[in-house]
Amino acid sequence: MANNFALREMKLNNGMVDSLNINLLPKEACHDAMMLKTKRMLTASSKRNSATGQKLPFLIRQRKDRIKEMETEFSQSFPPGPPKTQSFFRSSFRNEHFSSASNNDPESFHCAIGPVLVLAQFFGVLPVSGVLRPTPLKMKFVKFSFLTFYAASITATVLVMAILSIIHMIRTLNAKTFAVKGGIAAAMSGAMFYGNCMMGLILFFWLSPRWVTLQRDWRSMEQFIDSNKMQRPKLRWRLYAISSTILFLAVIEHILSIAVNAEKHDYKKGSENATFQDFLQIYCENSHAFILDTVAYNFALGMLIFIVSKLATFTWNFTDVFVMMVATGLAERYKMLNKDVMNSTSKHRNAIDWSGYREDYAALSCMVKKVDSDIAPIILLSFANNLYFICLQLLNGLSKSENSILDNVYFFGSFIFLVGRTVTVTLLTSRINDQSKLVLPALYNCSASTYNVETERLIYLLTTDEIALTGLRFFSITRNFMLANAFTKYTCRWLVQL
């Protein structure tokens, strides 16, 4: 104990910032990460913007928090637990007067995902203003605004379609339905499609005010890690490639769907039936028969069905795209951090800032947990939706005995697109878990001259903290989950055949 108090006194006299104890309780791990890096944040922030004299809110509380930390005893018997999100984000920069040149970084996640979110807002998704502003401090969710009213109107329209679909399902789903080939799919497909899209719009509406806070916390994490002059990930082209590829394939798949449902339309110019009204009626009767069983067809209803189906289709595809982009933003941060650690260990540097690396990994771990708490319902909806519609496509393919060439092209194209989209969202999301463990071999093999107690703490953090996005904690998205998901679909396929 005498040595412990002597060591603590020596650190106090030297004024060291990293005088925190090793035996921090788990609930203090994230706060520990912010405390230890205060000096580095001040230096980097002053270099980026010398004109501002303002500080992050957590720097103002630095002295009081440091005094509380000094009261703990030095001990190695209680290693630190995995970080939690609350302490870290309590000190995030929510001060609206804070400004920094790094806020204008075009490769920040907020700036990279902004244009994609603007496209989504045309379809009533995530009504948050300021998504194209250079800093998330300019973002806000206003309850009474045009964006909110527009999104609520689209959600209400999809809700009406979902109610009509559910009424049809209740009327037609009976014992005879199970005996008819393809009867279950005909009875439930409309209700499941519009019900899924309605839930997606509601969840994005629920996420909107949380998205503002999440983006500010995300930017705080980026500045926290970037203050170490670490290489930043190039996010813009990755997010653009993911969104444009998936949405382009979705457009092709939907065009094939329209062509299949309007196959009986006479496209000859001289024909009496070669009109848009005739095309619209044929399309609605084939694709939305479950609606027309409840409501008589007219041109206005046909236009409503045609427009709402496009809005719902976008939401159906964007749910997966959104999860992919968020997961890519986190995984790329881990990738850059791992690269920097591996470069340091491979060069056998005598002085490696293991404490700084541990703080960065702790901050990133906190960010993953914060993201998971906000988008977990959307992840659950995404995977449940993919599972159902893949099984539905299998059922439709096995039920139809006489198919045209266009039907076969649409079936195989749609099925391949669904499976590919599901595999892609699983692989991209599981990268977070993969990247969080990727640096461990380099830590195990680091030289004895660079290995210290901070290295051990970092190893403990990475091995014990489970870093992954989840579906409301029902499942964690890892590569093993993809195998389990594939086995589930394979089982459903055989059940459908029986």
Where are these regions (language model features)?
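Long, aromatic- and glycine/proline-rich binding clefts that accommodate carbohydrate-like moieties
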Residues: 456, 460
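C-terminal hydrophobic structural anchor segments
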Residues: 432-454
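Membrane-embedded alpha-helical segments and the immediately adjacent membrane-proximal loops
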Residues: 2-27, 37-43, 47-432, 449, ...
